[in-house]
Swiss-Prot record:
This is Periviscerokinin-1. Keywords: Amidation, Neuropeptide, Secreted. The keyword Secreted applies. The modification Threonine amide is found at T11. One of its GO terms (cellular component) is extracellular region. Belongs to the periviscerokinin family. Mediates visceral muscle contractile activity (myotropic activity). Its main location: secreted. It is found in: Secreted. The lineage of its organism: Eukaryota, Metazoa, Ecdysozoa, Arthropoda, Hexapoda. GO terms for biological process: neuropeptide signaling pathway. Expressed in abdominal perisympathetic organs and abdominal ganglia. It comes from Blaberus giganteus (Giant cockroach).
Length: 11
C-alpha cells in the first residue's frame, strides 16, 4: 500500500 510517508509495499 502506498498510504504512508514512503510508497512502499506496506501501509
Amino acid at each position: 500500500g502506498s498510504s504512508g510517508l514512503i510508497p512502499f509495499g506496506r501501509t
